[in-house]
């Protein structure tokens, strides 16, 4: 099973760009990643891939409105980057709107995530800021690593205060989320805002070149323009994932040793 990374947070905090940069970093060694977004108010397929012609039947809406979701259905609706075949994306297609599909069910999101994690090494769930979109709470519940990105201003702080009570259930692991200051600029009161929310794990500063990549439809090229603080935050995420993988490997070794011991005992 692949690792599931959930990216959520306040509007305008740079979640979509971070998801693309993270996907590029995770696939440097030719491992595979899928980014999934289910925010129909802004269909992401034409934003991610403005130069690729994408048919409507590639939409994630077709998957989420299915009776049952399995790996073959998911694989058939992943759009692979022509310029970088280790990354696939799933989202809504150009022209789709909230009336294009039936209401998404929480259980179907969980099925989608589970199926996607069986296909690739990493699944990045890029969430809407709107918690009434069931994809967001389901993605937070599903995440092996959850990344919370907030603008370091009053909007970001009050977004968090408003949504924290909705994530109080233990299945959301609220206290284990990594928190980053997104679109941080020199004039932001980072220390004060960090004190209010309980501290930052790192900064994802605003950069003109990164912004230009988003504007020009080259989001997957932006990793080349990350400044040292952005890169340090990205490395924290990569380190956290590496620690998880090491822990999983150790657990598998323990299970194998236990099974081997039990077999030897049975033979005696």
Please describe what each predicted stretch is.
Residues 2-41, 45, 116:
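Walker A/P-loop phosphate-binding motif and the immediately C-terminal alpha-helix
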Residues 7, 36, 91-92, 124-126, ...:
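Conserved beta-strand segments of the P-loop GTPase G domain that flank and frequently precede/overlap
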Residues 35-118:
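P-loop/Walker-type NTP enzyme "switch/lid" segment
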Residues 103-110, 161-187, 222-225:
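P-loop/Walker A phosphate-binding loop and immediately adjacent motor/lid segment at beta-alpha junctions
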Residues 122, 145, 199-202:
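Well-ordered beta-strand positions
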Residues 134-153:
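Inter-motif core of Ras-like GTPase G domains
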Residues 182-224:
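Beta-strand-loop-alpha "switch" segments that mediate conformational coupling across diverse proteins
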Residues 216-268:
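NTP-binding/hydrolysis catalytic cores, primarily Walker-type P-loop NTPases
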């Amino acid at each position: 099973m692949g690792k599931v990374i959930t990216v959520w947070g306040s509007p305008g905090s740079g979640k979509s760009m971070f998801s693309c940069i993270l996907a590029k970093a995770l696939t440097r060694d030719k491992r595979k990643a899928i980014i999934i977004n289910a925010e129909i108010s802004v269909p992401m397929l034409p934003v991610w891939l403005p130069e690729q012609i994408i048919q409507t039947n590639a939409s994630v809406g077709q998957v989420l409105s299915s009776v049952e979701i399995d790996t073959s259905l998911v694989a058939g609706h992943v759009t692979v980057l022509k310029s970088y075949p280790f990354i696939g994306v799933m989202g809504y297609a150009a022209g789709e709107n909230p009336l294009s599909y039936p209401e998404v069910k929480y259980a179907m999101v969980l099925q989608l995530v589970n199926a996607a994690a069986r296909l690739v090494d990493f699944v990045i769930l890029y969430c809407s800021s709107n918690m009434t979109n069931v994809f967001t709470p389901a993605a937070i519940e599903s995440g092996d690593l959850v990344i919370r990105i907030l603008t370091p201003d009053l909007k970001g702080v009050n977004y968090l205060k408003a949504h924290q009570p909705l994530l109080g259930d233990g299945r959301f692991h609220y206290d284990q989320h990594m928190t980053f200051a997104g679109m941080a600029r020199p004039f932001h009161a980072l220390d004060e805002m960090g004190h209010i929310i309980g501290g930052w794990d790192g900064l994802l500063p605003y950069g003109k070149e990164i912004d230009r990549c988003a504007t020009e439809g080259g989001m997957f090229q932006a990793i080349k323009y990350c400044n040292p603080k952005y890169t340090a935050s990205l490395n924290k995420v990569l380190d956290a994932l590496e620690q998880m993988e090491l822990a999983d490997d150790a657990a598998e070794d323990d299970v194998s040793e236990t099974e081997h011991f039990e077999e030897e005992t049975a033979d005696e």
